[in-house]
């Protein structure tokens, strides 16, 4: 039964309907008999191979290839301790002076694991005139490795900027070769140019890489079998969680009670999984996907439903955390508030088992900050005010909701998380700021056209055009450059500045950035769920990998 019975004329965003129905409501336990022991035995084999190769310097190049395969197959979480030991040993043994083969792979993996090795090692790739050597232009494998390595750049690394331009140009030319149009090489190049490894979601990369790895003559049968069994085992857990989310969603009859809002329970779970895919973060996924849903309702209520006066009252209710402030508001707003209260009560009960119930207060404070930013944007929209870039940035970094989502997800990370992680986020550190800049900018670039078809707060695009008297095209070019610069900042902070931050915490910030490259690249794939995201969801939650 719908709660919406009113005559108030409201804005209508006309969001596309939810497309999954009850598809994920039921969960059938997959047959797992005997699989646990097989996985355990395979893991021991791999651990033995890792440590044997580590103790033999002549095998270190092959060891890097082995670890790269482990990570791309999506099973690195089985071997965190061993992999960390490998890279710590390699950094101690070689520092910046790698003497093995495949320099690009060594460089990429060292930086991925937080070791800021020098990019000067690529100076040997250039000739006396400072150009990349012609001999590199036809080496497809070498070009791909250098291309992927270049995405580990930080601000001011001209040699990596040059390497990226050089490899993009060469790979693009090779991909156009008619004789390669249907080859695996051409497909590999196109995938890399579309989305480099550093920006890919680990779970989606595993799906892509498993069949590719199987085709390689040099593949390890042990790794391949473990990757397939591990993928299916983890998929079973993910499907169980998605069923929990679907039942929670259905219990609120969201489609009828909040018809103006985006109904995206499955997409919210996909997003949470993008950030926390590993098995140990089950509680984070379930909580964050529900919280994402409520964040979406809040965003749409401020953006595409409430009157200005209603939103002022609703904001006060959340700031005071008082249900008595809701008198006279639409039933939909009361429902959202009730959902917030209920989810906070549930998470507080869960956290109290470990004496961490006070972590709920961090989420509440960040929520209040976000809601205040929504209210500021509602005022700007009402007044048709176009702020300066500086004004817009100060508010929109908060309203984009990623700081809130980070804090919410942290709460359920178990022993990994402590008060200092929340306090770190509350200082607005450069890593989090760079992530918010990336997310805000890509969101605006992806959703700008659709949002400006209706009355909407000015996006970064309009602010830039007004402040710099620029064309829309100039604004797009400038903001795309900001996105690339934000990735450089994220890399720098991850490798250099955040050495004292728990690596598992910092990795969530990186994964959030990656998720946006999937959901907001070129368009708003979260609001307008297209074939690409539908296929991602089906492959992750419907289709099993044949073992």
UniProtKB/Swiss-Prot annotation:
Constitutively expressed in leaves and flowers. Signal peptide: none annotated. Its cofactor is Mg(2+); Mn(2+). The keyword Cytoplasm does not apply. The keyword Manganese applies. Keywords: Lyase, Magnesium, Manganese, Metal-binding. GO terms for molecular function: epi-cedrol synthase activity; magnesium ion binding; terpene synthase activity. Pathway: Secondary metabolite biosynthesis; terpenoid biosynthesis. Optimum pH is 8.5-9.0. It catalyses: (2E,6E)-farnesyl diphosphate + H2O = epi-cedrol + diphosphate. Mg(2+) 1 binds at residues 299, 303. A motif (DDXXD motif) lies at residues 299-303. It comes from the Eukaryota. Coiled coil: none annotated. One of its GO terms (biological process) is diterpenoid biosynthetic process. Its EC number is 4.2.3.39. Mg(2+) 2 binds at residues 299, 303. Mg(2+) 3 binds at residues 443, 447, 451. Inhibited by high concentration of manganese. Binds 3 Mg(2+) or Mn(2+) ions per subunit. SUPFAM superfamilies: Terpenoid cyclases/Protein prenyltransferases, Terpenoid synthases. Sesquiterpene cyclase catalyzing the production of 8-epi-cedrol. Able to convert geranyl diphosphate to monoterpens. Can use farnesyl diphosphate or geranyl diphosphate as substrates, but not geranylgeranyl diphosphate. Probably not involved in artemisinin biosynthesis. Belongs to the terpene synthase family. PANTHER family: OS04G0344100 PROTEIN-RELATED (PTHR31225), TERPENOID CYCLASES_PROTEIN PRENYLTRANSFERASE ALPHA-ALPHA TOROID-RELATED (PTHR31225:SF235). The Asp-Asp-Xaa-Xaa-Asp/Glu (DDXXD/E) motif is important for the catalytic activity, presumably through binding to Mg(2+). This is Epi-cedrol synthase. It comes from Artemisia annua (Sweet wormwood).
């Amino acid at each position: 039964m719908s709660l919406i019975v009113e005559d108030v004329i409201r804005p209508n965003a006309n969001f596309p309907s939810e497309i999954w129905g009850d598809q994920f409501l039921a969960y059938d336990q997959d047959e797992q008999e005997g699989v646990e022991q097989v996985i355990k035995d395979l893991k021991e084999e791999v651990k033995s191979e890792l440590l044997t190769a580590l103790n033999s310097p002549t095998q270190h190049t092959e060891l890097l290839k082995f670890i790269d395969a482990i990570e791309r197959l999506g099973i690195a979480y089985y071997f965190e301790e061993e992999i960390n030991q490998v890279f710590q040993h390699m950094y101690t043994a070689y520092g910046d002076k790698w003497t093995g083969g495949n320099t690009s792979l060594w460089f990429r993996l060292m930086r991925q694991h937080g070791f800021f090795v020098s990019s000067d090692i690529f100076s040997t790739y250039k000739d006396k005139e400072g150009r990349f050597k012609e001999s590199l232009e036809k080496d497809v494998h070498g070009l791909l490795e250098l291309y992927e390595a270049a995405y580990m750049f930080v601000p001011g690394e001209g040699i990596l900027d040059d390497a990226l331009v050089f490899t993009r140009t060469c790979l693009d030319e090779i991909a156009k070769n008619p004789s390669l149009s249907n080859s695996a090489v051409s497909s590999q190049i196109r995938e890399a140019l579309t989305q480099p490894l550093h920006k890919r979601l680990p779970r989606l990369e595993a799906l892509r890489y498993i069949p590719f790895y199987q085709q390689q003559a040099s593949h390890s049968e042990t790794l391949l079998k473990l990757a397939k069994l591990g993928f299916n085992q983890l998929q079973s857990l993910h499907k169980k969680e998605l069923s929990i989310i679907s039942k929670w969603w259905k219990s609120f009859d969201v489609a009828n009670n909040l018809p103006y809002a985006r109904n995206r329970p499955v997409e919210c779970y996909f997003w949470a999984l993008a950030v926390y895919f590993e098995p140990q973060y089950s509680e984070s996924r379930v909580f964050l996907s529900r919280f994402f849903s409520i964040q979406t309702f809040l965003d749409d209520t401020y953006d595409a439903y409430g009157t200005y006066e209603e939103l002022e009252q609703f904001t006060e209710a959340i700031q005071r955390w008082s249900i008595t402030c809701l008198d006279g508001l639409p039933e939909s707003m009361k429902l959202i508030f009730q959902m917030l209260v209920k989810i906070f009560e549930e998470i507080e009960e869960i956290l109290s088992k470990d004496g961490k119930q006070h972590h709920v207060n961090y989420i509440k404070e960040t929520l209040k900050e976000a809601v205040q930013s929504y209210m500021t944007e509602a005022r700007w929209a009402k007044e048709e005010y176009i702020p300066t870039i500086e004004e817009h940035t100060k508010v929109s970094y908060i309203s984009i909701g990623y700081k809130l989502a980070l804090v919410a997800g942290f709460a359920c990370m178990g022993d990994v998380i402590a008060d200092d992680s929340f306090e770190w986020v509350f200082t607005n550190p450069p890593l989090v700021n760079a992530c918010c800049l990336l997310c805000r900018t890509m969101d605006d670039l992806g959703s700008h056209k659709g949002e400006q078809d209706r009355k909407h707060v000015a996006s970064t695009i309009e602010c830039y055009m007004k402040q710099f008297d620029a064309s829309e095209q100039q604004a797009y070019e400038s903001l795309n450059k900001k996105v690339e610069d934000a990735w450089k900042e994220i890399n720098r902070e991850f490798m250099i500045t955040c050495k004292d931050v728990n690596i598992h915490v910092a990795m969530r910030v990186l994964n959030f950035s990656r998720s946006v490259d999937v959901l907001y690249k070129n368009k708003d794939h979260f609001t307008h769920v297209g074939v690409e995201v539908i296929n991602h969801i089906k492959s992750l939650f419907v289709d099993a990998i044949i073992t």
